[in-house]
Structures are given as structure tokens and as C-alpha cells.
Amino acid sequence: MQSFIFFVFLIYGFFPHCQSINDGNIKINLPNQQDVIYRYTRSERGDPAEKEGSVFKLRTTVFFVVYGLLVLLAFIAFLVWRLRRSKTQEKRKNMALMNIYSDLRDTGDAMPEELKNRPLNDKLDYLPYKKQYEIASENLENKSILGSGNFGVVRKGILKMASPKNEEEKKMRLTVAVKSAANCYDISQTSMLAAELRLMCSIGRFPNVLALVGAVTSELRKGRLLIVTEYIDCGDIRKYLIDHRNVFQDHLIEDKTEPDSYLTPISAKRKNYVFKNTDENSDYVIKESLDSLTTSDLLSFGLQIANGMQYLASIPMVHRDLALRNVLLKKNKTIRIADFGMARTHENKSYYIPQKTKDAPVPVRWMSPEAFDTMKFTEKSDVWSFGICLYEIFTLGQLPYPDVPSERIYEYMHSGRRCPQPQHCHVELYDLMKLCWHEKPELRPNFSNCVEYFIGHMKKSASKLLENVDEMLRVEAENQRKLEDWIRVERSESV
């Protein structure tokens, strides 16, 4: 009531000289108090429909205003949450990268005695990063992508010499392969890459093993870790064999000097090497042209893989995924065993996911039975895989067990069945394959035995080829030694 009286006096004060207001058929004289009261009462008793409409509009307006404010507040709250979450994740990421960087730079804790004779794979946490492999980022230029997978990207790179001694060396450039994480924000990928780097540092350099040139670790705290290796220009051997099947020259033919007998089955007739080159000095010699493919090349590939695996086993180190797709080929037909890192793409159709591993694809066509059973890998399981590699070589890249589905490989192996003798394979080498595929691991040869077997076989049948391979590997060892000159900060004048 007091508010109403105040309202009346307010109007009276604002309109002291007004005479009348014409509101429809009602004439109201102001500032007569009675008239003002009458108008107020008339307004309150107005049309109910109009009053209801006004109330509805008011409620609608209030609803949308309140709803809008709530949405705005919710959006602001969401932004604040995202910002805090992002900062928390960024902080955790930076701490994780710092830990990886510190672990990589740390000389490492003393290795437990029980691990000292174990393969490198079992003691990754204790393997140091050797600082002499560090490459200044300004000396490395990344180029086109060579390949990529779920965990890593490999690019072609150009490396400048760290300490050139003259103008000629300043102009020199080395083509390299540069591996990085597929997603630099994924800590697990960076961690696996760091583990692979420590592994490669400990492996060292050997002619038939992909050599580490160096690494860029200075920007690891920003999520950037680069592994720099030799650039191998011709891809993997399996693809090369498949692509050159139509030009293959088979020098392994049936031996006509052996007496024919109806008691000797056709499948048992022996084949020997007959090299058809007319130039005596060119017999057994590997042609560096990639356009040619002969039996000599197949023998050379087999020996070189055995040679590289013998070196890895001597470290010791277990490969776990030895297959021709992981053996690279240079233009001069020397090979490099590669892909012994922790990160695997598993995009190859020859991989199969067994029930035991649930979601971890494994190369069942190359795996030994005991590795399939226990998921534990040893030199002897690698030897089994080497036998499969020989099968791939002498079938010119054919898939092992081509008629057996991946999910039935385990059953097939345990039944005692094995891959048949390839058409282009000497019987002595097939005997080696069967030894590699012995059901009992302890009865399989080791890689030193495999190298000796190969050398003995080639001495009898292709001695000049053996000399040729030895010379190629000597040159490759020297080329790998020179890789140090590209990253060494201080070089003597005699270098």
C-alpha cells in the first residue's frame, strides 16, 4: 500500500501541469488524485486475455534469459576444465619427456649380475646412449617420407659433416634415413624410439646389419627424437625377388652325370650348379646390376643373412622378427638386417593374432613352435626363422606355407609338416633348412653352424662366389667405419 501511495505522488510530481489523458472512451484529468487512482484501477481490471499474454511473454523472456545464462556458465566452466586438463596433461607430458631424456643421457645404473649374459632385449633399461652418436640438429635436413607405420615415420635425410677439414668436405653430403615417432605427442612412441636407439648403440656396426649413423636427442624434451641410420636404396629383398622373377637365371640343373635308375624317384634326383658364363673370371661373380638375378645372388643373400645373424647372436641379441621383409638390399647386392626395434607396424597380412596374445599380432609363418607356445624368443627361434628366410629366397619371395591359412599354421607345424624343398634350392641347403626346423630347439644349429655350413657348401660348388662375397663385405665394413667421420666433432688431421 505504501508503494502504491509513493507511485501516486511520483506521478503527481512528474505531471503537475497535465490536464487530461484520452484513453479510449475514458477521459482522465491529471493531476487529480481521484482520476489517477481510477486509471490505475482501470488498468488492473483490464482485458484478461491481454494480461495473460503479457505474463506469458514475461515468463518466456525470463526463461530464455535464465537458460542463456546457464548455457553461458556451463560453457565457461567447460573451457576452464579443458584449460586445466590441458595444462595438467602438458605438465605430465613434459615430465615424461624429461624422464626419457634423463634416462637416455644417464650412464645407467650398474647392471645386475644375472642380466650380464642375457640378450640385449632383456636389459634395455640398463643400456646407455653413447654420446659420441649425437648429431647437431642444424647438420641434418629432412626430406621426403620413405615409409610410415602406426608407430614411426622414416624420412630421407641429408647430413652435413660435423667437423669438415677443408672446403671439399664442407660441400660433402651424406644421404641417410631418419626415423621419428609417428606422433610426437604420444609418450609411448617416443619411449619405444628411445629404447630402439639404446639398442642400436649397443649393437654397433657390422656389414650385414643396418648401421646407426647417429641421433638427435637435444630436442627430446620438446618431443622430437630422431634416429639416423644408413640409407639403403633398394628396399627389402622379398620385393626385389618378386619383381625380378621373370629375369631369374637358374644355374641349378639336374645332374646328368649320375647313373639313372628306376629305383631312384624323380624327386630324389640331385641338382648341381652349372654356371654358364663363358668368361672364366666372371664365373660365380655377382653382377652389381639390379636388373639381373641369378642363383649366385640367392646363395649370396643366404650367406649374408647367416653372417649378420651370427654377429647379432654373438652380442647377444635376439631379433624376434627375422623375415625377408626386414632384410634390406643395396645396389651392390649386399644386405642389411633391419627392424630390430621395439615398435612394429603389424600391418602385413602374414601376421596373425593368436588367442594367447589377444591383441598382439605375431609373425606366425616365421615363428618356431616353442615361441608360439610361450611367446619367448631365443637364438634358436631366430634360427627357425632363418630357415624360413632361406625358403623365401629359393622360392623367389613366395609366402611360407602358401596353402595353409594363418590360423592353422600352429597345428600344421605340430603335426611335423614343413615347407617343401624349393625348386631353385640345392638339396644340401634344403637339408640345412630342415635342421633349422627341428622340433627340439636344442637340436637346431646355431648361427655359427649355419655360416660354416654355407661356407662349406659354397667352397665345394662356388668357391669364386665365396671370394666375391668376402671382398664385398670387406668394402662394406670399411664404408661403415667411415660413418664416424660424419658425426665426430673432433677429428685428427690424419683422418
Swiss-Prot record:
Q: Does the keyword Cell membrane apply?
A: yes
Biological process (GO) annotations? cell surface receptor protein tyrosine kinase signaling pathway
Q: Which residues lie on this side of the membrane: Cytoplasmic?
A: 82-495
Q: What is the protein's membrane topology class?
A: Single-pass membrane protein
Care to name a GO molecular-function term for this sequence? transmembrane receptor protein tyrosine kinase activity
Q: Which organism is it from?
A: Caenorhabditis elegans
Q: Which PANTHER family does this UniProt record tie to the protein?
A: PROTEIN KINASE DOMAIN-CONTAINING PROTEIN-RELATED, TYROSINE-PROTEIN KINASE RECEPTOR
Q: Write out the transmembrane intervals.
A: 61-81
User: Function, please?
Assistant: May be specifically involved in cell-cell interactions regulating cell fusions that generate the hypodermis during postembryonic development. It has a role in the development of the HYP7 hypodermal syncytium.
Catalytic activity, EC: 2.7.10.1
Q: Where does the protein end up?
A: Cell membrane
Q: Which UniProt keywords apply?
A: ATP-binding, Cell membrane, Kinase, Membrane, Nucleotide-binding, Receptor, Signal, Transferase, Transmembrane, Transmembrane helix, Tyrosine-protein kinase
| Family of the protein in this entry | Belongs to the protein kinase superfamily. Tyr protein kinase family.
Q: Which residues lie on this side of the membrane: Extracellular?
A: 23-60
Stated name of the protein:
Receptor-like tyrosine-protein kinase kin-16
The record, for PROSITE patterns, names: PROTEIN_KINASE_ATP (PS00107), PROTEIN_KINASE_DOM (PS50011), PROTEIN_KINASE_TYR (PS00109)
Q: Which GO terms describe its cellular component?
A: plasma membrane; receptor complex
Please tell me in which tissues this protein is expressed: Hypodermal cells.
Active site: which residues?
D321
